[in-house]
Amino acid sequence: MPKTRRPDGPPRRVRPAARRGQLAHVLLVDGNIGIGGAPERLLARAAALLAPGGSVLVEAGPHPGEWWCGTVRAGAGPDVPWACVGADALRALAPAAGLAVYAVSERGARTFVELVA
């Protein structure tokens, strides 16, 4: 995880990034499934990082069947690629990444989907 010494400073890496097959769990919450606007690629990358028996925990979008890809803008910043994927849509996306739904859990208004290889 890159860190900076100052808020506007360049990041420095404090430890090597994870390699294929090294992680027990990958956590994609708070909308992180949308990073890059290609959830299928993000799931494939997450699956590749998993050690045998590992899982990917994804916070799904608020609408179960939703699968939206496009761009968003935060304030005056540039457009960035983003996606939103509901729990049912994750069930459809998971097999292409070699994953399957193991469990779905709701906590208040939030839905979490655990995927396993």
PLM ranges: what are they?
Residues G9-R15, H63-P64, R107-A109:
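Conserved beta-strand edge residues that scaffold enzyme active sites
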Residues G21-R41:
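A short SAM/SAH-binding and catalytic strip from SAM-dependent methyltransferases
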Residues V80-V104:
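Short alpha-helix
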Residues A97-A117:
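Core SAM-dependent methyltransferase catalytic element
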Residues S55-A76:
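Conserved class I S-adenosyl-L-methionine
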Residues P11-P16, G37-E40, A44:
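Active-site glycine-rich loop that binds ribose-phosphate moieties when present
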Residues E40-S55:
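A short glycine-rich, Lys/Arg-flanked "PGG" loop and its adjoining helix->strand segment in the class I
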Residues P2-G21:
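S-adenosyl-L-methionine
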